[in-house]
Amino acid sequence: MEMAFSERITRLKSSLIREILAAAQRPEVMSFAGGLPAEAMLPAVDWAELPASMGQYGMSEGEPALREAIAAQARALGVPCEACQVLIVSGSQQTLDLASKLFIDSGTEVLVEAPTYLAALQSFQLFGAHCLAVAQQADGPDLAALRATLEQHAPAFAYLIPTFQNPSAVRYSEAKREAVAGLLDEYGVTLLEDEPYRELVFDQGSARPIVSRLKRASWIYTGTVSKTLLPGLRVGYLIASADLFPYLLRLKQSADLHTNRIGQWQALQWLGSDHYQAHLGQLREFYRVRRDAMQAALTEHFSDLATWELPQGGLFFWLTLKQPLDSRTLLNRALAEDVVFMPGEPFFVEPDANPGYLRLNFSHVAAERMDEGLRRLAQVIRDAGALEAA
């Protein structure tokens, strides 16, 4: 008997990263695939003071004190907001789902970076979006291409990750942030700005969010505690311009009533506190060491195979292969060597037209195992390249 599924189910794609992580459960496998925080850096949390009342239903907007704390944090970054514009969500992934429901019908145009976050593409395309890709450069999007796209199309929104982008690790320059804000204002395009990695910075660089520079365009700004505290809490937030917030709140109510209050309570014990700042300092130093270990191993084993930039934050290296193999074809061979990685092709709107990229996570594999893991992966790529050239 044929099931009466919705039309959108024909666009439902499996998550490649979930499939890879499932295949990599053996303890001997070295995984450079996911964006998992290092388990050694998951902070010890205290539940002793959790009020019994947190077991009750809560407000769809989220806990008032947490909303106040997030609004204060955002204002310090230059985001013009009050607590009444903050919505606590079940991880910032839910922001993408809510924005998809708010804006996207079949054929709706959405502007994204090339490459962009894989799970955002999946959400937008599930709802029927036609994604318009603008190429990334080392300091942000190609501005000429961005202007040309906005002249020729009318996207419902632009989805951008300007600070240590996933997957490319690009951080937009100040000049690019100003220019992007100016273009979105000029063409009246809503901005969805995603900043899960802002706190994971390894140099002294900093840049105000793009939403803080907008003068006319509507906006949504989203973040999470998953990369700095505990991803298992499933606590994120969105802040939205006043014209969008009521619709996002109603969509949240219809999706899951409210984000879990126990996770919200725990997040509130950390945000803005001295022990949170101390934890962030330890986290940055820990990941800087792992970033440097991966840089050394890549220099040793990949210099003849790929090019890359040293990331100044986030959790990833983005490699461009000198011989543009379809990196998806390397997965099974790498797994046979007890190594997994994330192919770069699925991060593009047109995967088959963009072969030869790898995303490597440096947060999860211990520094002392990194060299061996990347040596094995380099050999897999070298062997595949020789086969293709033969």
Model regions and ranges:
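Conserved glycine-rich beta-strand-loop-beta hairpin in the small C-terminal domain of fold type I
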Residues: 268, 285-295, 307-320, 332
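Conserved core of the PLP fold type I
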Residues: 54-187, 198-217, 287, 368, ...
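Short, conserved charged micro-motifs
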Residues: 325-330, 368-372
